[in-house]
């Protein structure tokens, strides 16, 4: 299994086992984010400022990276790396920041179900940029696997759950509220295309600079999250009046922040030693974890559409990673 396939060539079996464990752990943590966030809701809304949670997540990543550097400083190569190598990570942080904010603005121009279905186009944009920017070629078998991933995401988003007692699958709505009709405006479509392109570009660009630089991953993360903290601090300061910095935080909110921070570090290892395609499979496979936790913690019922999505994901994994 090659690096691009999500494995580590030439590694001894214990190291390969640790790599596989890391992939499973990242998948589980990615899938747990939405259910944990739902458990934070009070009266149907998030009681804290989202910008506070994002800033705390970036700060946690930065502190974990700094601690890792302090612990392993004796194993570093001699000499101080030139700080100009930090500059490329400013663009990476900017792309991630733009992507996160576009998600918020997209909700104004389309309904949530339309967004969930169409946002799976980022799988195609990531694969296209992966081939164009990194010079990799995907076989017809691998291309079909990625198409199956897109179809699985669309199936899952279009009706993987239903509320107990509800005969039709679909997104939950407030009691007594009329369901929002499916819609998307021309501006919303343009923003969605931009979102998918930026999502793919941020992933591929980060992979490119991480693999080109011969620097420890912890130092690269330090560069990335330093810029991330600066950017999100500015976004928080400019977000206008609202709850205080830690107002509304609960134990579940702290768990959301820690989960996102640790998973961000795991994802950076995937980008350094794996590939953007590996990341796509982690995100897609996390739908299964998301569904199981939503059923257990939120009492949502799985529908036949979910099992179809899970089947498509399994087929995609077999096609992409299996022997021809």
From Swiss-Prot:
Coiled coil regions in record: none
Keyword terms: Golgi apparatus, Membrane, Sugar transport, Transmembrane, Transmembrane helix, Transport
Cellular localization per UniProt: Golgi apparatus membrane
Pfam family, one: Nuc_sug_transp
InterPro entries: Nuc_sug_transpt
Residue spans, topological domain Lumenal: 40-52, 107-142, 202-214, 272-279
Topology of this chain in the membrane: Multi-pass membrane protein
Listed name of the protein: Probable UDP-sugar transporter protein SLC35A4
